[in-house]
């Protein structure tokens, strides 16, 4: 493709749409990041950034964080709701609550809180869903508005800690998920002499669509039914504590792709709110939970990896629906709270690593089979001869199917001992040559060709062996088929010569990325520049800032990767602010209760027993360095 342009690359990888303006492709074919929207012309080349970090001693893979993206996401979400409130003359405010389960890393939480440090009245709070998370937010919430929302299942200790938070000066909303939690709250609040701030999680009848739709609906794991909510109201009245009920919460599930689902959920929950007010409850906060989606594939659709709405539309719909319902019931408008963790964090982090090798099919000349060869091989040669003679378009599909059928028969004959290994190898090479030739002759404009084009792209794709663990760094790609944009970090100024799939370095056949953003859709292979052993080849995995770190596991004992915080200064200078070392081999051994110190003693015994004296020190040093080393491959330079 001599007419390839950078615009073709941008469209081919759909960068413009999924990146939200934070990532792009330069005119030189390099992937860049623009972390500071105030200075959009200040860009960082990710390829050069990674090489600089390696020179500074930071081994790949490395997770790179851009805190300025977090700041922008916080402020843009608050601004969207502020504008919607003004537009619809809504008579209350908006509070953004960050659920730290999405990414509990201290750097991430602190940067989110710092995003509104200059505001006189911050619009930020924190959410906890467990006792460890609550202990964290009790220490950090004073940097925000000191609002804490406590979700999740609770025991007496959890409730005591939440009530102690009130004594520490925080505004702590204890959201009741089960009816039994109310009894514990009443007892512990009386014992501590603290008036609790209570919330209810309503179990809506409406259920949104998506991978997390089980979070809503009548069979949801969480929340109270209408009858249970009435019981809570009655028990609070009996204890003269109805004024403590101040918040209504619901959650449709993460990554809600359709704005109509959000409207419908808010509408139903809004009526719960107004009915509670009519019963005398002092509810003044309306917590819509999560659900604000991330457009991972950039298609602006209702797919599980996308969303059919923008930020302004999201805020407008919530404010508009709630305004109308409150006016209908003649009830005061509550403060709106959202827990939009995925939206805040997904874009800020990129995993950068290197391709350590490839397995690629290269067309080879094939010679006709010997005259005495089985007839099957002669049939395959005939198909190839017909194809190389430039068969017409109508015959292409027939030739392809004949070749596939012949290959299956060849495998069957080999299994029966009727085909030699050399004959089987010839049949496989002949089939690959037919596939390669057919692939080049088919046209995507012909709808009958498209399924075969997809099939051949997958069959003939290069295998890129990439220095990372899918299970550690992209667990959702494996566990729930989540799509993450993947890009080579350079060479995009030239037309892609190959299609490839990315395989990790675990000893597991599931360690493969099998979905890729390609234009306005999802494909099973990715168009890429050809790999060369003579030059470094870096790959970026994007939008990995939400959930992936905390969900990652240590399959094959591949641990946490190195990470770095990178900021672009007002003068355009790139500043690598901090680097956090990933797990060493000794670290991951300890995680599974293996004693690295004891192992070292065993090594010494074995070395003394089996190794010559003049080699012992060197061998022991190698073993000790191995225990202290990175769990990933370290040959990139």
Swiss-Prot record:
<dbReference type="InterPro" id="IPR022644">
    <property type="entry name" value="De-COase2_N"/>
</dbReference>
<comment type="pathway">
    <text>Amine and polyamine biosynthesis; agmatine biosynthesis; agmatine from L-arginine: step 1/1.</text>
</comment>
<keyword id="KW-0479">Metal-binding</keyword>
<feature type="binding site">
    <location>
        <begin position="286"/>
        <end position="296"/>
    </location>
    <ligand>
        <name>substrate</name>
    </ligand>
</feature>
<dbReference type="InterPro" id="IPR029066">
    <property type="entry name" value="PLP-binding_barrel"/>
</dbReference>
<comment type="function">
    <text>Catalyzes the biosynthesis of agmatine from arginine.</text>
</comment>
<keyword id="KW-0663">Pyridoxal phosphate</keyword>
<dbReference type="Pfam" id="PF02784">
    <property type="entry name" value="Orn_Arg_deC_N"/>
</dbReference>
<dbReference type="Pfam" id="PF17944">
    <property type="entry name" value="Arg_decarbox_C"/>
</dbReference>
<dbReference type="Pfam" id="PF17810">
    <property type="entry name" value="Arg_decarb_HB"/>
</dbReference>
<dbReference type="GO" id="GO:0046872">
    <property type="term" value="F:metal ion binding"/>
</dbReference>
<dbReference type="GO" id="GO:0008295">
    <property type="term" value="P:spermidine biosynthetic process"/>
</dbReference>
<keyword id="KW-0745">Spermidine biosynthesis</keyword>
<keyword id="KW-0456">Lyase</keyword>
<keyword id="KW-0460">Magnesium</keyword>
<keyword id="KW-0210">Decarboxylase</keyword>
<dbReference type="InterPro" id="IPR040634">
    <property type="entry name" value="Arg_decarb_HB"/>
</dbReference>
<dbReference type="GO" id="GO:0008792">
    <property type="term" value="F:arginine decarboxylase activity"/>
</dbReference>
<dbReference type="GO" id="GO:0033388">
    <property type="term" value="P:putrescine biosynthetic process from arginine"/>
</dbReference>
<dbReference type="InterPro" id="IPR009006">
    <property type="entry name" value="Ala_racemase/Decarboxylase_C"/>
</dbReference>
<comment type="similarity">
    <text>Belongs to the Orn/Lys/Arg decarboxylase class-II family. SpeA subfamily.</text>
</comment>
<dbReference type="InterPro" id="IPR002985">
    <property type="entry name" value="Arg_decrbxlase"/>
</dbReference>
<feature type="modified residue" description="N6-(pyridoxal phosphate)lysine">
    <location>
        <position position="101"/>
    </location>
</feature>
<dbReference type="InterPro" id="IPR041128">
    <property type="entry name" value="Arg_decarbox_C"/>
</dbReference>
<dbReference type="GO" id="GO:0006527">
    <property type="term" value="P:arginine catabolic process"/>
</dbReference>
<dbReference type="InterPro" id="IPR000183">
    <property type="entry name" value="Orn/DAP/Arg_de-COase"/>
</dbReference>
<keyword id="KW-0620">Polyamine biosynthesis</keyword>
<protein>
    <recommendedName>
        <fullName>Biosynthetic arginine decarboxylase</fullName>
        <ecNumber>4.1.1.19</ecNumber>
    </recommendedName>
</protein>
């Amino acid at each position: 493709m001599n007419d390839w342009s950078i615009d073709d690359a941008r469209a081919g990888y759909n960068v413009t749409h999924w990146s939200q303006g934070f990532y792009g492709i330069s005119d030189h074919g390099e992937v860049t990041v623009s972390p500071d929207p105030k200075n959009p012309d200040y860009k960082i080349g990710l390829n050069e950034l990674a090489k600089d970090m390696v020179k500074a001693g930071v081994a790949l893979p490395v997770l790179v964080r851009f805190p300025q993206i977090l700041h922008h996401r916080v402020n843009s979400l608050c601004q969207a709701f502020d504008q919607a409130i003004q537009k619809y003359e809504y008579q209350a405010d908006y509070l953004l609550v960050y659920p730290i389960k999405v990414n509990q890393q201290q750097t991430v939480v602190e940067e989110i809180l710092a995003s509104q440090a200059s505001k006189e009245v911050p619009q930020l709070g924190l959410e906890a869903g467990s006792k460890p998370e609550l202990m964290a937010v009790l220490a950090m919430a004073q940097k925000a508005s000191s609002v804490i929302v406590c979700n999740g299942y609770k025991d007496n200790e959890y409730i005591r800690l939440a009530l102690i938070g009130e004594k520490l000066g925080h505004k702590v909303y204890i959201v009741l998920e089960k009816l039994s939690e109310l009894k514990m709250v009443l007892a512990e609040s009386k014992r501590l002499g603290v008036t609790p701030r209570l919330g209810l999680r309503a179990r809506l009848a409406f259920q949104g669509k998506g991978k997390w739709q089980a979070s809503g609906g009548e069979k949801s794991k969480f929340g109270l039914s209408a009858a249970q909510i009435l019981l809570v109201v009655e028990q609070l009245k009996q204890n003269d504590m109805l004024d403590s009920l101040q918040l209504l919460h619901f959650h449709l599930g993460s990554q809600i792709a359709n704005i109509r689902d959000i409207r419908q959920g808010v509408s139903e929950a809004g009526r719960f709110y107004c009915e509670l007010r009519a019963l005398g409850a002092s509810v003044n906060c309306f917590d819509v939970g999560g659900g604000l989606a991330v457009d991972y594939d950039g298609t602006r659709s209702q797919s599980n990896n996308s969303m059919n709405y923008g930020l302004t539309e999201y805020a407008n719909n919530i404010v508009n629906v709630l305004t109308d319902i409150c006016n209908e019931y003649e009830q005061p408008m509550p403060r709106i709270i959202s827990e939009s963790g995925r939206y805040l964090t997904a874009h800020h982090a990129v995993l950068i690593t290197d391709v350590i090798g490839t397995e690629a099919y290269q067309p080879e000349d094939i010679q006709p089979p010997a005259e005495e060869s089985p007839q099957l091989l002669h049939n395959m040669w005939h198909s190839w001869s017909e194809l190389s003679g430039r068969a017409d378009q109508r015959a292409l599909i027939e030739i392809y199917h004949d070749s596939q059928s012949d290959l299956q028969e060849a495998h069957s004959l080999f299994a029966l001992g009727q085909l030699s290994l050399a004959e089987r190898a010839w049949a496989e090479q002949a089939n690959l040559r037919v596939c390669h030739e057919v692939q080049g002759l088919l046209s995507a404009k012909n709808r009958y060709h498209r399924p075969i084009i997809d099939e051949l792209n997958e069959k003939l794709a290069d295998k890129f062996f990439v220095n990372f663990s899918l299970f550690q760094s992209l667990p959702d790609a494996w566990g729930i088929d989540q799509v993450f944009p993947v890009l080579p970090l350079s060479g995009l100024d030239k037309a892609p010569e190959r299609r490839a799939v990315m395989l990790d370095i675990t000893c597991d056949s599931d360690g493969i990325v099998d979905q890729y953003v390609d234009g306005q859709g999802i494909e099973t292979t990715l168009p890429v520049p050809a790999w060369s052993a003579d030059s470094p080849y870096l790959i970026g995995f994007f939008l990995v800032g939400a959930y992936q770190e905390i969900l990652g596991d240590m399959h094959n004992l591949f641990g946490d990767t190195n990470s770095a915080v990178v900021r672009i200064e007002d003068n355009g200078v790139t500043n690598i602010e901090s680097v956090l070392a990933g797990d060493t081999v000794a670290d991951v051994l300890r995680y599974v209760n293996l004693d690295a110190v004891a192992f070292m003693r065993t090594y010494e015994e074995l070395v003394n027993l089996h190794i010559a004296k003049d080699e012992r020190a060197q061998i022991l040093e190698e073993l000790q360095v191995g225990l202290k080393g990175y769990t990933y491959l370290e040959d990139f330079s």
